[in-house]
């Protein structure tokens, strides 16, 4: 389960138009969330609130042997008015879904909308005006062409927003903070810090400089822990990356190219469009280099990913391959959205030096049933009336035929109640499971009860059937 502050931070990225998917460290994000999802330990309660469009708070209390907790505060310079903050209104897929579909790449002059209209995300479609997303302060930017590709960085500075976040852990008195500052449409800087007595020099600071041009993304980092210097990069090609001027809110060339062909080429156009829809996706290749200035050691890795795009009409899938040539590790993952309610993922690790290998599989299964009904196979609690059959055409009566006339008009039927329809957020919960080569299993059920979002899970070791349960926990969140 994503924490409320992570949900708000993602909303900040969406409001400012920053694409978190276009980074090298997010290459394996889909399979990682489907397989390595965290399991709750003990009992943990979280109370959160988006008090104003600019300010959010969160209080957490947990018990794992000892009672601990944390206090969090977040401030955003841009009003976050386009999201649902109440726990009874937050779309569950936006908070719990693990399969992450890539967002469309935007050209340098276009406004980004990360909270897209993907039906699988559970999020509302992008607003029709910049006022609905950026507030009244963006009217001048709209007049200057913010949505038409004009240069508005100097006009109003809508891309120069910032986010401040702080969290205090009790009773350890550990303090962490984060500052996100957007300088231009393509440049963003993050500074993260942790202060704790047990750490070297009493704490550590991590600085990130991120540069995103859509077709490629670069990232430089420095950490005071070991004097680590690093550089990461990701380059995209194929799909929407092949055209830097592709408008994400207009049909892709593979969908409507037949409208520009003459009648003699309709068949060829349909075949080409169908072929493009069948394999329409984006390739990404990248790598990272890092060096520790204190311990005089370094490392590197290379990676590649293919993922289908939202315009793809077939089965959404993501495949990745990463290699660490110095350590000899090869990692391959494959994830797909088998159905709208079912996602599957698998991962294989192999070391060319030791010949050791590991594998793991994971899945998430969404349901519109309560937990008990889901496990017992009961019918869903939402009863949807079947669609009425179309009325049959009534023949003329015998009397009307004898008198060579039409039947008298029938009285208007009484209005019938509108049948129930499925809501956008029809799911009541999701079951997540994973299994690795050591026969360690993780089970997690996440859902909503009234205004509470809960997560209950356990870790099971099948090698120790006498004491199989390794962990058990319950986490409850409430936000207003």
From Swiss-Prot:
Q: What is its main location?
A: mitochondrion
Q: What does this protein do?
A: Component of the ERMES/MDM complex, which serves as a molecular tether to connect the endoplasmic reticulum and mitochondria. Components of this complex are involved in the control of mitochondrial shape and protein biogenesis and may function in phospholipid exchange. mdm10 is involved in the late assembly steps of the general translocase of the mitochondrial outer membrane (TOM complex). Functions in the tom40-specific route of the assembly of outer membrane beta-barrel proteins, including the association of tom40 with the receptor tom22 and small TOM proteins.
Indicate the quaternary assembly.
Component of the ER-mitochondria encounter structure (ERMES) or MDM complex, composed of mmm-1, mdm10, mdm12 and mdm34. Associates with the mitochondrial outer membrane sorting assembly machinery SAM(core) complex.
Q: One matching Pfam family, short form?
A: MDM10
Q: What topology does it adopt in the membrane?
A: Multi-pass membrane protein
Species of origin:
Neurospora crassa (strain ATCC 24698 / 74-OR23-1A / CBS 708.71 / DSM 1257 / FGSC 987)
Q: Which gene encodes it?
A: mdm10
Q: Which GO terms describe its cellular component?
A: ERMES complex; SAM complex
The record's InterPro entries line, in alphabetical order, gives: Mdm10
Q: Which PANTHER family match?
A: MITOCHONDRIAL DISTRIBUTION AND MORPHOLOGY PROTEIN 10 (PTHR28035:SF1)
Q: Which UniProt keywords apply?
A: Membrane, Mitochondrion, Mitochondrion outer membrane, Transmembrane, Transmembrane beta strand
Cell cycle among the record's keywords?
no
> Where would you find this protein in the cell?
Mitochondrion outer membrane
Free-text note on domains in this protein's UniProt record = Lacks alpha-helical transmembrane segments, suggesting that it resides in the membrane via beta-sheet conformations similar to those predicted for other outer membrane proteins and porin.
Protein's UniProt name: Mitochondrial distribution and morphology protein 10
